[in-house]
Amino acid sequence: MRALVPAVLLAALLPVSPAAAQSAGPYDPVRRDPLGTVLINGATPYTLGSRRLEVLFTHRFQQPVNQGGDSHNLWGLDSGADVGIGLAWGAAPHLDLSVYRASFQEDFELAGKFLVLEQAQRLPLTVAVRAGVDHLRRPGVEDPTRPFAQLLLARKLALGVNLLVSPSWVRDTPRLRNAFNVPLGLSFPIPGNSLIEIEYIPANRDLGDSLDAWHVALSKSVGGHIFEIVAGNSRATTLDQMLGGDSAAGFRKRDVRLGFNIVRDFSFF
């Protein structure tokens, strides 16, 4: 049953007729919703555009709210946190180059993303390819250099409603070699010009005790900023820690951890 979920959602990306166009020409891209280049933890297929800079800050608290989190430790907010900072540069209209550093195991993620197609009246999908490497600088980490590749697919179904499917491979996770998985994403609008975003990564069937990872975020776009309040069970924010359901930080299916993302875009024209 678990294996059917990505297949069903992938099929949903390919309807008989495309969504209602929001642009005049049949190949003019539909207007994007403010998802950014990263949904919650995983990459979207969207690029920044030429000569644009994006700065990303992530914060994931270590203490689960439902395991010892209470008013005395502000429901886990007094605990330590994994912090990440990233930069992405629009090197060309359809090409982004990015670097992201997570404090957990000093994990650097270097990547390039190329936007192949963008959804339009006669193009039902947005398609991008992304490739790069995670490099962990913490001494003692096994297989610290971990190449990866992704096919990033998205379809805008209605205003604020987006479905994302991202078949992905990474050479090494904490416990797997040549791990493949299909992260899924969904967004839908709520009052106040905000979005609810959902990410789900199925447990990896190549590892018996792999766990499903899930995250939910309340996302608000204000000017050149995107602010997200995040809840989820895993602290992983890099692909090598996500795809295997075996993050070295450890997590349980029913954990609920809080966090936030702050994104700021700059234009240099």
Report each predicted region and the residues it spans.
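Positively charged n-region of N-terminal signal peptides that target proteins for export
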Residues: 1-4
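Bacterial N-terminal signal peptides
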Residues: 6-16
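Transmembrane beta-barrel domains of Gram-negative outer membranes and organellar outer membranes
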Residues: 21-139, 144-149, 154-172, 188-195, ...
